[in-house]
Regions:
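Internal catalytic-core helix/loop-beta-alpha segment
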Residues: 100-134
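Alpha-helix termination/capping residues and helix-transition junctions
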Residues: 44-47, 119, 174
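A structural micro-motif
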Residues: 2, 72-73, 120, 178
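Metallo-beta-lactamase
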Residues: 30-31, 121-124, 129-203
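Active-site HxH/HxHxD metal-binding segment of metal-dependent hydrolases
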Residues: 29-35, 39-112
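Conserved beta-strand hairpin/beta-sheet module of binuclear metal-dependent hydrolase folds
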Residues: 1-42, 133-149
Length: 203
């Protein structure tokens, strides 16, 4: 199993996850650089040690800090690469929250279902956005804004779709998930599958 370090987000930031000291999942909204860097350093990692940034989807609160890591490759699902490259503030939800520019248009790697990142497999989970993904290693689910602790799911009014979300949660229900590492809020330990079932019951 990969080593996962939870970096809790605050204000507009998403949660971020450090994997194996060289991969960062999501980078927050880009407003708290000193905080993010301090958390990396607490775990013995310098910002320039990050070789890969994986964005779980294209919204500004998950991609806003991508430019903090100019030496890292930026990876996102191919469907969410489009609004990022186009600097589409509607598609990245920046407009909805008063952020008129995300300052992040670079995508180096277009991810697809089944791609591998360290010990994780990419699972395409549209619903919150067209190109939302989760990362799954047989025990741990880094869920982005698809699933949250307590049965929550990502909002579907900012480029999402209800039927896609329902299908994505159905897909996740087939996994024997132990721990959930969501895009916002607390993590789930030991009974992740129960939280996914609860999410489905709310849809």
């Amino acid at each position: 199993m990969s080593d996962i370090v939870f970096i809790i987000g605050f204000n507009h930031d998403s949660n971020c996850y450090l994997i194996n000291k060289n991969t960062l999942v999501d980078t927050g909204a880009g407003q708290n650089k000193d905080y993010l860097f301090s958390k990396l350093r607490e775990n013995g990692v310098e910002p320039e040690d990050i070789e890969l940034v994986v964005n779980t989807h294209c919204h500004f609160d998950h991609i806003g800090g991508n430019h903090f890591f100019p030496n890292a490759k930026i990876a996102v699902h191919k469907l969410d690469a489009i609004p990022i490259r186009n600097e589409d503030t509607l598609g990245t939800a920046g407009t909805a929250f008063g952020f008129e520019g995300v300052n992040n248009s670079r995508v180096d790697i277009e991810l697809e279902e089944g791609d591998k990142i360290a010990d994780f497999e990419v699972i395409h989970t549209p619903g919150h956005t067209k190109g939302g993904i989760c990362l799954w290693d047989g025990e741990n689910l880094i869920s982005g804004d698809t699933i949250f602790a307590g049965g929550g799911v990502g909002r579907m009014d900012l480029g999402g779709d209800y039927q896609d979300m329902k299908s994505s949660v159905e897909k996740l229900m087939r996994l024997d998930v132990k721990n959930i590492y969501p895009g916002h809020g607390p993590t789930v330990e030991n009974n992740g599958k129960d939280h996914i079932k609860l999410s489905y019951s709310y849809l």
